[in-house]
Structures are given as C-alpha cells and as structure tokens.
A protein has these predicted regions:
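Beta-strand/loop substructures that line and gate deep hydrophobic ligand-binding cavities in soluble
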Residues: 84-130, 147
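Short beta-edge strand/loop motif at the mouth of beta-sheet-based domains
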Residues: 10-11, 30-63, 149-153
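Short, highly charged C-terminal tails/helix-capping segments
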Residues: 138-153
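Amphipathic alpha-helical segments
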Residues: 16-34
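Hydrophobic pocket/interface hotspot
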Residues: 22-23, 32, 51, 66, ...
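Short acidic N-proximal helix/loop "leader" segments that mark the beginning
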Residues: 1-10
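Hydrophobic/aromatic beta-strand elements that line small-molecule binding cavities or substrate pockets
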Residues: 13, 63-68, 93-100
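A short, structured loop/turn motif at beta-sheet edges
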Residues: 19-20, 67-74, 98-107
Length: 153
C-alpha cells in the first residue's frame, strides 16, 4: 500500500542509558508495568511469539505477534487493539521499535502505522505513546515515572 493510504505516528526520544538496559525496560514485564500505567507485557520475545498487553484485572488492551526481533536493536510487532471496538475494527497495525546508541544515550524511535488513511487508531496511539515513553525515559534516568495517571483512561 502506498504512503498516501497509510496512517503513521513516529516518536523519537533520547534516553541516557545503554541499548541492553533499554531493551530490558521494553521487554521485562515488571519494568513495563512501572511506566505503562500498571499494564504489563506477556511475550516469548522470539519471531512468531504471541504478544499481549495485560491490565491488572487480566483484561487485554492489545494483542499481536513478534514479526521481527533483533535484541537490543530492533523489534516489529503486529499490534491489534482489544479494548476499544472502534479501534479494534480497523484491524492490526504495525509497531517498530528501533534502538540506536548515540554518545551516552540511546535514540529510541517508535513507528506505529496502519494501512488505512485517517486511522482513529493512529490518532489514539499518538496521544498514548508520548506519556508512556516520557515515563520510560524518566524511570530509566531518575528512577521515577513522570506521569502516574494515563491520559484518557
């Protein structure tokens, strides 16, 4: 599908850490819970592994599959919203994590895209990713999250 028919959100941040530490923060369930508003991740972290985000009550926010994985540099997830019927109806999206060392930091680029124009899912994630990634950055650099209440939830 050409770019005109695709919706995309890209977020770039620099985090003072190492690629292995950032990778662990992105994939270790108890660490994820700290910055992702008490939601955690479950996955085997291999190509083809099922992937899911789980609330404390056991309900799913998102599910998917690992499409590509190259620790600690790159990961691509087929991502399906599960909690909002309107967003779920758009079908699966694709989320790419890229980690690049830069001096004493890591450049983290998140690209979340779907093959449909004017996606409500991409509008929603464009509001959610900044708060989660701000928390991730704060937690790795200071030991504390910046935001304790998920905006919009």
């Amino acid at each position: 599908m050409n770019a005109a028919n695709r919706s995309r959100f890209v977020y770039v941040t620099f985090i003072r850490t190492t690629p292995p530490n950032l990778w662990e923060a992105l994939t270790e369930p108890q660490f994820v819970r700290q910055y992702w508003f008490n939601t955690t991740v479950e996955c085997g972290w291999k190509k083809g592994s099922p992937w899911k985000m789980v609330r404390p009550d056991g309900s799913l926010t998102d599910t998917g599959e690992i499409l590509e994985i190259d620790p600690p540099r790159r990961m691509v997830i087929r991502w399906q919203n599960e909690w909002n019927p309107e967003l779920k109806a758009e079908g699966p999206s694709r989320c790419t994590y890229e980690l690049d060392p830069v001096d004493s930091a890591v450049k983290l680029t998140i690209t979340h895209e779907i093959d449909r124009p004017e996606s409500k899912l991409i509008t929603a994630v464009s509001g959610a990713w900044p708060s989660c990634l701000s928390n991730l950055k704060s937690l790795l650099e200071t030991g504390e999250v910046a935001i304790t209440t998920h905006p919009g939830h």
